[in-house]
Amino acid sequence: EIVPRDWSSDVCSSDLPGFCEGSAWQFTWYVPHDVKGLINLIGERQFIDRLNAGFATSEKVSFNALGDNMGAYPINHGNETNMQAAYLFSYTSKPWHTQKWARAIQEKYYGMGPRDAYPGDEDQGQMSSWYILSSIGLFQMDGGCSKDPVWLLGSPRFDRVEIQLDNTYYSGKKLIIKAENVSKDNCYIQSVRFNNKRLSNN
Protein backbone atom coordinates (compact mmCIF):
# COMPACT_ATOMS: atom_id res chain seq x y z
CA GLU A 1 0.00 0.00 0.00
CA ILE A 2 1.32 3.44 -0.91
CA VAL A 3 0.03 6.26 1.26
CA PRO A 4 0.92 9.90 0.53
CA ARG A 5 2.64 11.71 3.35
CA ASP A 6 1.07 14.65 5.08
CA TRP A 7 3.87 17.16 4.48
CA SER A 8 2.51 19.43 7.22
CA SER A 9 3.52 16.80 9.80
CA ASP A 10 7.05 16.19 11.03
CA VAL A 11 8.70 13.60 8.80
CA CYS A 12 12.12 12.13 9.50
CA SER A 13 13.51 12.88 6.08
CA SER A 14 17.20 12.34 6.77
CA ASP A 15 16.84 8.55 6.69
CA LEU A 16 18.76 7.03 3.78
CA PRO A 17 16.83 3.78 3.08
CA GLY A 18 15.44 3.94 -0.43
CA PHE A 19 17.79 6.73 -1.49
CA CYS A 20 21.26 6.55 -2.99
CA GLU A 21 23.75 9.15 -1.75
CA GLY A 22 21.11 11.46 -0.35
CA SER A 23 17.95 11.76 1.71
CA ALA A 24 14.28 12.40 1.11
CA TRP A 25 14.81 16.00 2.22
CA GLN A 26 17.64 16.54 -0.25
CA PHE A 27 15.92 14.88 -3.18
CA THR A 28 12.77 16.94 -2.56
CA TRP A 29 14.62 19.95 -4.01
CA TYR A 30 16.15 18.11 -6.95
CA VAL A 31 13.68 18.95 -9.71
CA PRO A 32 15.91 21.00 -12.06
CA HIS A 33 13.54 20.50 -15.00
CA ASP A 34 10.53 22.09 -13.23
CA VAL A 35 11.50 24.31 -10.30
CA LYS A 36 8.42 26.50 -10.70
CA GLY A 37 6.22 23.40 -10.57
CA LEU A 38 7.91 22.36 -7.32
CA ILE A 39 7.33 25.82 -5.83
CA ASN A 40 3.66 25.68 -6.79
CA LEU A 41 3.34 22.22 -5.26
CA ILE A 42 4.93 23.16 -1.94
CA GLY A 43 3.76 26.78 -1.82
CA GLU A 44 6.24 29.64 -2.18
CA ARG A 45 6.33 30.72 1.47
CA GLN A 46 6.87 27.16 2.72
CA PHE A 47 9.38 26.53 -0.06
CA ILE A 48 11.49 29.53 1.02
CA ASP A 49 11.14 28.85 4.76
CA ARG A 50 12.05 25.15 4.52
CA LEU A 51 14.99 25.74 2.23
CA ASN A 52 16.32 28.58 4.41
CA ALA A 53 16.01 26.37 7.50
CA GLY A 54 17.97 23.63 5.74
CA PHE A 55 20.76 26.04 4.84
CA ALA A 56 20.87 27.48 8.37
CA THR A 57 21.21 23.97 9.85
CA SER A 58 23.89 22.91 7.39
CA GLU A 59 25.90 26.13 7.69
CA LYS A 60 27.04 24.92 11.13
CA VAL A 61 28.95 22.10 9.42
CA SER A 62 30.08 24.22 6.45
CA PHE A 63 27.47 22.58 4.18
CA ASN A 64 29.60 19.43 4.25
CA ALA A 65 28.72 15.88 5.29
CA LEU A 66 31.93 13.88 5.32
CA GLY A 67 32.26 10.20 4.53
CA ASP A 68 29.09 8.19 4.13
CA ASN A 69 26.94 10.72 6.01
CA MET A 70 25.53 12.20 2.80
CA GLY A 71 21.99 12.47 4.13
CA ALA A 72 22.86 13.56 7.67
CA TYR A 73 22.38 17.28 6.99
CA PRO A 74 19.79 18.99 4.82
CA ILE A 75 22.28 20.70 2.50
CA ASN A 76 25.32 18.64 1.55
CA HIS A 77 26.96 20.81 -1.09
CA GLY A 78 29.44 18.10 -2.02
CA ASN A 79 26.78 15.92 -3.60
CA GLU A 80 24.88 16.33 -6.87
CA THR A 81 21.44 16.44 -5.28
CA ASN A 82 22.24 19.69 -3.46
CA MET A 83 24.59 21.61 -5.72
CA GLN A 84 21.75 23.60 -7.28
CA ALA A 85 19.98 24.29 -3.97
CA ALA A 86 21.28 27.82 -3.35
CA TYR A 87 19.99 28.91 -6.76
CA LEU A 88 16.44 27.65 -6.20
CA PHE A 89 15.58 30.95 -4.51
CA SER A 90 16.12 32.64 -7.89
CA TYR A 91 12.75 31.23 -8.95
CA THR A 92 10.94 32.85 -6.01
CA SER A 93 10.02 36.42 -5.10
CA LYS A 94 13.08 36.51 -2.78
CA PRO A 95 16.09 35.87 -5.02
CA TRP A 96 18.48 37.56 -2.56
CA HIS A 97 18.57 34.30 -0.59
CA THR A 98 20.45 32.83 -3.57
CA GLN A 99 23.09 35.54 -3.22
CA LYS A 100 23.39 34.95 0.53
CA TRP A 101 23.70 31.17 0.45
CA ALA A 102 25.82 30.86 -2.70
CA ARG A 103 28.33 33.25 -1.12
CA ALA A 104 28.18 31.42 2.23
CA ILE A 105 28.97 28.13 0.48
CA GLN A 106 31.94 29.72 -1.30
CA GLU A 107 33.26 31.08 2.01
CA LYS A 108 32.65 28.05 4.21
CA TYR A 109 32.76 24.95 2.01
CA TYR A 110 35.68 25.76 -0.26
CA GLY A 111 39.16 26.48 1.08
CA MET A 112 42.68 25.14 1.61
CA GLY A 113 42.20 22.87 4.65
CA PRO A 114 41.72 19.08 4.76
CA ARG A 115 37.91 19.47 4.93
CA ASP A 116 37.89 22.06 2.17
CA ALA A 117 38.43 22.36 -1.58
CA TYR A 118 37.12 19.09 -3.05
CA PRO A 119 35.78 16.96 -0.21
CA GLY A 120 32.73 16.10 -2.26
CA ASP A 121 31.76 14.88 -5.68
CA GLU A 122 34.25 16.26 -8.20
CA ASP A 123 32.82 14.24 -11.11
CA GLN A 124 33.86 15.84 -14.40
CA GLY A 125 34.96 19.00 -12.61
CA GLN A 126 31.59 19.62 -11.03
CA MET A 127 32.78 21.17 -7.75
CA SER A 128 35.28 23.50 -9.39
CA SER A 129 32.79 24.46 -12.12
CA TRP A 130 30.19 25.38 -9.49
CA TYR A 131 32.74 27.55 -7.68
CA ILE A 132 34.00 29.30 -10.81
CA LEU A 133 30.51 30.01 -12.16
CA SER A 134 29.25 31.16 -8.76
CA SER A 135 32.27 33.41 -8.25
CA ILE A 136 31.45 35.27 -11.46
CA GLY A 137 27.75 35.38 -10.55
CA LEU A 138 26.31 32.82 -12.99
CA PHE A 139 24.64 29.41 -12.77
CA GLN A 140 22.55 27.12 -14.96
CA MET A 141 19.92 24.99 -13.26
CA ASP A 142 19.80 22.46 -16.08
CA GLY A 143 23.57 22.03 -16.31
CA GLY A 144 23.81 23.41 -19.82
CA CYS A 145 21.44 20.83 -21.33
CA SER A 146 18.77 23.23 -22.58
CA LYS A 147 18.43 24.26 -26.20
CA ASP A 148 17.67 27.77 -24.95
CA PRO A 149 19.77 28.06 -21.78
CA VAL A 150 18.67 30.20 -18.87
CA TRP A 151 21.42 31.76 -16.78
CA LEU A 152 20.61 32.49 -13.14
CA LEU A 153 22.32 35.40 -11.45
CA GLY A 154 24.32 35.08 -8.28
CA SER A 155 26.77 37.50 -6.72
CA PRO A 156 30.07 38.20 -8.56
CA ARG A 157 33.25 38.25 -6.47
CA PHE A 158 35.13 40.31 -9.06
CA ASP A 159 34.57 43.86 -10.25
CA ARG A 160 35.17 42.81 -13.86
CA VAL A 161 35.16 39.47 -15.70
CA GLU A 162 35.67 39.11 -19.45
CA ILE A 163 34.69 35.88 -21.22
CA GLN A 164 35.68 35.27 -24.84
CA LEU A 165 32.73 33.72 -26.72
CA ASP A 166 32.97 31.09 -29.44
CA ASN A 167 31.24 32.47 -32.56
CA THR A 168 30.07 28.94 -33.40
CA TYR A 169 27.57 29.27 -30.56
CA TYR A 170 27.24 32.98 -29.79
CA SER A 171 26.61 36.06 -31.88
CA GLY A 172 28.76 38.31 -29.70
CA LYS A 173 32.53 38.24 -29.27
CA LYS A 174 32.70 38.54 -25.50
CA LEU A 175 30.63 38.70 -22.35
CA ILE A 176 31.76 41.31 -19.85
CA ILE A 177 30.45 41.17 -16.29
CA LYS A 178 30.95 44.33 -14.24
CA ALA A 179 30.04 44.58 -10.57
CA GLU A 180 30.22 47.67 -8.37
CA ASN A 181 31.25 47.76 -4.71
CA VAL A 182 32.46 44.16 -4.72
CA SER A 183 33.66 42.87 -1.35
CA LYS A 184 33.65 39.69 0.71
CA ASP A 185 30.59 40.81 2.67
CA ASN A 186 28.75 42.78 -0.01
CA CYS A 187 26.89 40.04 -1.86
CA TYR A 188 23.43 41.49 -2.51
CA ILE A 189 22.51 42.64 -6.01
CA GLN A 190 20.68 45.95 -6.21
CA SER A 191 20.04 46.02 -9.96
CA VAL A 192 21.19 44.30 -13.16
CA ARG A 193 21.61 45.60 -16.69
CA PHE A 194 22.21 43.49 -19.79
CA ASN A 195 23.20 45.38 -22.96
CA ASN A 196 22.18 48.57 -21.12
CA LYS A 197 18.65 47.27 -20.43
CA ARG A 198 17.55 46.84 -16.84
CA LEU A 199 16.45 43.30 -15.99
CA SER A 200 13.54 42.42 -13.71
CA ASN A 201 14.06 41.07 -10.18
CA ASN A 202 13.94 37.39 -11.10
Task: List each language-model region with its residue ranges.
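Extended ligand-binding clefts on enzyme/binding-domain cores
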Residues: 9-42, 75-76
